[in-house]
Amino acid sequence: MSSRRAPTPATTGGVPPSALRPPRPRGSDVFIRLVCAENLMPELATIRALLPQYPYVTVYAEHAAGGGDYADADGRVALPPGVRVEGLPAAARYALAKIDVDAFPLLRLGITLCDAHGRLPSLRAVPWAAAAAASVWQVELLPSRGSSSSSGGGGGGAATLRALAYALRATGVVSPETWGKVTWVAHGGLYHLGFFLKALTGGAPLPDTRGEFLAALRGYLGGRVFDVRYVAARVPRGVTLKGPLAYLAALLGAPAAAARGPWQAGEKSLAACQVFMRIKGLYFAWDGINMHAGCIDGLHAPPPWS
């Protein structure tokens, strides 16, 4: 599966992408819908309208706390020699994550919707396009408050965290009405859900304690929240699903793994979605995956056999 991003002013000679007819999509393409300040509300309204049919929402937060796929879920704060993040208690791991999430800006937010079978919504890139393509979203965000910048998202400037927070609630994408109906997914949830919570609060610092953080997630998203990394570590004995997101996608045969890099938030949310759906179908088809709802890697104790 390959992915294509929407055209940007840099590649269209300054002509807004909405004035151009995109190339005819191939059946295996996934179209990355770039979202900016200009089209933030209508795109999130589209997402809200699709939730009854596509109730699985995977988010991927691309932030400035460090590069690399695995680094996106691990702490950036320097630790004493010989001390590993994995060996720290949950309270300490949360404290390190809070330092990073509070200090670093959220650059992009990838959003992928799918149904219970992993199928993506098909949308036209522009109203007059001849064919629809499977689509995911990538929200371009200002790196900090008060700064001004332009991005390729729909030909307009990047959105602010406050604008994103308002749009998520105003459109009903995040609403008590969706509790129990929408399943939220992230890979390495301590960081990606932490940055998503930062977005939902318009850039406010994370709660002071692990318990308050988990309560805030439940308050905004409800009880159906899954961390792909936590779930991947809880598959039956003899199965090892550890490593970066790109590695897991390739190992499990996720179509997103075939896309050429560099991946951005949109592609990574797609990969995380496909990895989660494959783990769910392969290892939790009989017992169900709901036992792991609300559990975040690093914040919850592993089962006895881990």
What kind of feature is each model-predicted range?
Residues 4-5, 75, 79-81, 88, ...:
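Metal-dependent phosphoesterase core characteristic of DEDDh/y 3'-5' exonuclease domains
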Residues 7-112:
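Entry/capping segment at the start of metal-dependent catalytic domains
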